[in-house]
Each structure stands twice: as structure tokens, then as C-alpha cells.
């Protein structure tokens, strides 16, 4: 509940400020790239969040099974993220060949796609690490808000804004990744162990 409130309040605060400060054309560029990024994200995560939350919840009392499920899903998500990110960066010229600003925004927002490798919030939720999730989210949102107010001061600061948003997302995932390593461990996984997961993840 607390995280949902944060997710409502902070976008209102930042959105109002940014819409007032940034050039409307540049802000429109940001939103356009954000729309394109939202197309790539599902392919990077491959449905791991929903499936992983349920799968870890079912085996959370068994350490060995938890480690195996975590490792399977992490490696699969990592593979999907690498493939998707490669396609994302390889095709950016197709979208904005003659617009340098859009290209820069596109490249910087690619950081969010790369960061999906460390997106393991489904493990924290399954293990009910709710206090950690709330405080981590609150601190990152506050730092993001302060950074926007401090550095986005001119109508041309769209790249700075994009960088702040992308690094905030990456930091959120990376912190969770290192936090969860106290609860789960990587185990050796064979490719054949991943095949049974494909259909459930696509469902």
C-alpha cells in the first residue's frame, strides 16, 4: 500500500515540475521514447515477475528449491534482457535517423532496459521483504526528486532529466539485487532446466 502511494505522489510532483520547466517539444521526445521503451520491456522481462512471484511463494520454505527457481528465472531473464537490449540499441537509427536529441534520449533510456537484468523485485515480494521495498523506494524517489529540482532548471535539460530517470530505475534494481543475495544463492543450472519454464511464462 505504501509503495502504491509513493508511485502516485512522486509522478505528480515531478510531472508537474518537468512539464513547466522543460521545452514541450523535448518533453514530447522523452514521452515518445518512453512509449517505444515500453514495447521492448515485456520482451526483456518475459513474464518473469508474475510467474516468479508465484513460483517463489510456493517453495519459499525450501531453501534449495527457492535457490533453484530463483537461478532458473534470473538466468532466463538475463538472456532475454541481453537479446532485447541488443535489438534496442541496434535499431535506434531506424526511429530517429535525423534527430540527434531523440537519439541521445533513446540511448540514455536504454539504461533502463539493461537494468532489467537486476530486476528481482518478485523475489522480495515473494519473501515478503515489504519494509525493505518501501524504504528503498522512498529513498530513491526522494533522491530522484531532489536531483530533478536541482539539475533540471532549463528548458533544454531533457538529457539530464532522462539520465536522472534512467539511473533511478537502475539504482532501484541494483540495490534490490544485492539485498536479496542474503536470502537466495545462485546454483548451477543447465539449459534443459529452463525449457519447462517457457510455456508457463508465455501463458
Region locations from a protein language model:
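Interhelical loop/hinge segments that connect adjacent transmembrane helices in multipass membrane
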Residues: 131-135, 158-165, 171-203
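Residue-level signature of transmembrane alpha-helical cores of multipass secondary-active transporters
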Residues: 1-4, 38-39, 73, 77, ...
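Residue-level recognition of pore/gate-forming positions within transmembrane alpha-helices
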Residues: 4, 8, 35-38, 81, ...
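Membrane-interface helix-loop junctions in multi-pass transport and translocation proteins
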Residues: 19-26, 93-103, 127-132, 138-173
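Membrane-interface helix-capping segments at transmembrane helix termini in multi-pass transporters
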Residues: 22-33, 59-71, 82-114, 154-161
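Signature of the first transmembrane helix
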Residues: 1-49, 145, 199-203
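Membrane-interface junctions at transmembrane-helix termini in multi-pass inner-membrane proteins
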Residues: 113-135
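Membrane-water interface segments that mark the loop-to-transmembrane alpha-helix transition
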Residues: 1-7, 33, 38-42, 46-92
Amino acid at each position: 500500500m505504501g509503495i502504491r502511494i509513493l508511485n502516485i505522489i512522486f509522478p505528480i510532483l515531478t510531472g508537474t515540475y518537468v512539464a513547466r520547466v522543460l521545452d514541450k517539444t523535448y518533453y514530447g521526445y522523452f514521452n515518445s521514447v518512453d512509449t517505444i521503451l515500453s514495447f521492448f520491456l515485456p520482451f526483456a522481462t518475459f513474464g518473469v515477475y508474475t510467474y516468479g512471484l508465484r513460483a517463489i511463494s510456493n517453495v519459499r520454505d525450501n531453501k534449495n528449491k527457492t535457490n533453484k527457481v530463483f537461478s532458473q528465472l534470473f538466468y532466463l531473464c538475463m538472456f532475454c534482457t541481453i537479446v532485447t537490449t541488443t535489438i534496442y540499441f541496434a535499431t535506434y537509427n531506424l526511429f530517429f535517423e535525423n534527430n540527434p536529441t531523440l537519439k541521445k534520449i533513446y540511448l540514455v533510456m536504454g539504461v533502463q532496459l539493461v537494468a532489467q537484468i537486476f530486476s528481482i523485485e518478485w523475489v522480495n515480494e515473494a519473501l515478503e521483504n515489504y519494509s525493505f521495498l518501501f524504504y528503498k523506494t522512498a529513498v530513491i524517489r526522494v533522491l530522484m526528486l531532489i536531483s530533478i529540482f536541482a539539475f533540471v532548471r532549463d528548458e533544454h535539460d531533457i538529457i539530464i532529466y532522462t539520465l536522472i530517470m534512467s539511473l533511478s530505475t537502475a539504482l532501484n534494481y541494483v540495490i534490490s539485487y544485492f539485498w536479496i543475495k542474503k536470502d537466495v544463492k545462485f546454483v548451477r543450472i543447465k539449459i534443459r532446466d529452463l525449457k519447462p519454464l517457457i510455456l508457463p511464462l508465455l501463458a
